[in-house]
Swiss-Prot record:
Its EC number is 2.1.2.11. One of its GO terms (biological process) is pantothenate biosynthetic process. Its cofactor is Mg(2+). InterPro entries: Pantoate_hydroxy_MeTrfase, Pyrv/PenolPyrv_kinase-like_dom, Pyrv_kinase-like_dom_sf. It catalyses: 3-methyl-2-oxobutanoate + (6R)-5,10-methylene-5,6,7,8-tetrahydrofolate + H2O = 2-dehydropantoate + (6S)-5,6,7,8-tetrahydrofolate. Mg(2+) binds at residues 42, 86, 118. The gene is panB. This is 3-methyl-2-oxobutanoate hydroxymethyltransferase. One of its GO terms (cellular component) is cytoplasm. 3-methyl-2-oxobutanoate binds at residues 42-43, 86, 116. Keywords: Cytoplasm, Magnesium, Metal-binding, Pantothenate biosynthesis, Transferase. It comes from the Bacteria.
Length: 257
C-alpha cells in the first residue's frame, strides 16, 4: 500500500483503521488484526521507553523501532499495512534542510513510506512543502499536538470559535500543501465532521468522534496496558490487570513446585 491509496479509501467511503506499534510483537499483532496502516508513533517514548512525554524521543529511536515493527510483519509485502513514522520533536522544527535530512534518513533506513508531522505553523508549512517536493509523503496532525504540550497542555482543542476557525484553516492549508492525510486529535465531533466534509484527503481521528474517515489508537491504551489512560480512549480489555493476574498465578505455582 502507498500513502496515496488512502485517498481512494475516502472516495470509496472505506473506513481507514490504524494502530500504533513499537516493536516486532506489536507490529505483528497489528498486521494480523488487519489494520490498514501502522503508525510508529512518538508515543513509544512513554509506552516503551518509560519517558513522561514524547519530547525525549530521538531520530535514532524512531528508526530503530520502525525497523523492529516491520520485522514483525509476516504477510506478503503487497498485503502488509502501510507504515508511517512520526518525526520526533526537534527533527523538523530545526529548519528545512535539517528536516529533509532527518526525514530522508527515516525513509531510507526503514520500511516507512511516509512521515507524520505535528502542527501547521508557517515554519512547519515550509518544511512540509519542501518534504513533499522532495518526494517524501507527509501526514499532517492538528488539534491536540502532544509535542507542544509545554505551551498548549494536553487539553481538548477547538472548543472556542477562534480555535475552531484556526483548526479548520490549518486543515485546509495542509491539504493544499500536499499532505495525503491528516490526524485530528482530541477535538469536538462536529468540528471533525465539518473538516471531513470539506477536505478531499482523509481525516484520521483520535478522540475526534466517529465522523472522520478513519480511526487510530495507541495500541497500549486500547489494550489497557497503561496506568494513565487518555480520556478519549476506552480500553477494550484491562490488559495490564489480566497479565499481572496470570503472571502472579504462575509465579506462585512455580514457588510451590
Amino acid at each position: 500500500m502507498l500513502p496515496s491509496d488512502l485517498v481512494k479509501y475516502k472516495k470509496n467511503s472505506q473506513k481507514i483503521i490504524a494502530l500504533t506499534a513499537w516493536d516486532s510483537i506489536s507490529g505483528s499483532i497489528a498486521e494480523q488484526a488487519n489494520v490498514d496502516l501502522v503508525l510508529v508513533g512518538d508515543s513509544l517514548a512513554m509506552v516503551c521507553l518509560g519517558y513522561k512525554s514524547t519530547l525525549p524521543l530521538t531520530l535514532g529511536n524512531i528508526i530503530y523501532h520502525t525497523n523492529a515493527v516491520s520485522r514483525g510483519f509476516k504477510k506478503n509485502i503487497e498485503e502488509q499495512p502501510l507504515v508511517i513514522a512520526d518525526m520526533p520533536f526537534l527533527t523538523y522544527q530545526c529548519g528545512e534542510d535539517k528536516a529533509v535530512e532527518y526525514a530522508g534518513k527515516i525513509i531510507q533506513s526503514t520500511y516507512a513510506k511516509a512521515v507524520k508531522i505535528e502542527g501547521a505553523e508557517p515554519e512547519i508549512q515550509k518544511v512540509i512543502s519542501r518534504l513533499i517536493r522532495m518526494g517524501i509523503p507527509v501526514m499532517g496532525h492538528i488539534g491536540l499536538t502532544p509535542q507542544s504540550y509545554l505551551n498548549l497542555g494536553l487539553k481538548k482543542q477547538g472548543e472556542s470559535l477562534e480555535s475552531q476557525e484556526k483548526i479548520k484553516k490549518e486543515a485546509s492549508i495542509l491539504e493544499k500543501l500536499g499532505c495525503f492525510s491528516i490526524v485530528l486529535e482530541h477535538i469536538p465531533d462536529l468540528l471533525a465532521k465539518e473538516i471531513q466534509n470539506t477536505l478531499t484527503i482523509p481525516t484520521i481521528g483520535i478522540g475526534a468522534g466517529n465522523y472522520c474517515d478513519g480511526q487510530v489508537r495507541v495500541t497500549a491504551d486500547l489494550l489497557g496496558l497503561n496506568d494513565d489512560q487518555p480520556p478519549f480512549c476506552q480500553p477494550i480489555i484491562q490488559g495490564k490487570e489480566l497479565f499481572m493476574k496470570k503472571l502472579k498465578e504462575w509465579v506462585e505455582s512455580e514457588r510451590l513446585n
